[in-house]
Amino acid sequence: DVSTIDPVTLRRGIGYVIQQTGLFPHMSVAKNIACVPAILGWDRDRIDARVDELLDLVHLDPAVFRDRYPAQLSGGQQQRVGLVRALAASPDLMLLDEPFGAIDAITRASLQDELLRIHRNSGKTFIFVTHDVTEALKLGTKVLVIDEGRIQQYAEPDELLARPATPFVRELLACQATRAMAGG
């Protein structure tokens, strides 16, 4: 029951990834990743090891990237740093709010694949918010479709595709299929 948990403690147990990365522009990649572990009182050696481990996880060489600043990174690199910053303190829950919405399609597909790999290997719960149905179907073990604040369907991707529960879900999937056939 989360209502019994101190709100600050609760928030520190959630990793957040947002659309525009939210990286601190005046801090290096290493310091951005180290923020929450430092707040939690981790020692310097543990933080440094975790920063390097996480950069390796997303294929960013620590020797090359730890001292760079966000402005020196591509959009995809910034998203990778934003993702590992959220993972830095090993939260049980990850909240990802349209993290891949502002990057090109090739980088987006690559990041989606990386996220799937990380999710499979982490054992953590990921809540991923997106307006892209294809992305939801690719990344979700369960997909929640909401229209005007009302739940339309909550199901595994295969079930959602096979048995849309409402006219809205049917139309949403049909629009997505039309876009996919058109190459968009």
Model regions: which residues?
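Short helical segment in ABC ATPase nucleotide-binding domains corresponding to the A-loop/adjacent helical element
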Residues: A30-A38, D48, D52
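Catalytic Walker B motif of ABC-type/P-loop ATPase nucleotide-binding domains
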Residues: M94-D97
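Conserved ABC ATPase "signature" region
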Residues: D45-V64, R117
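Conserved ABC ATPase signature
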Residues: R68-L73, Q77
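Conserved catalytic motifs of ABC-family nucleotide-binding domains
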Residues: S90
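ABC ATPase "signature
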Residues: Y154-A155, R163
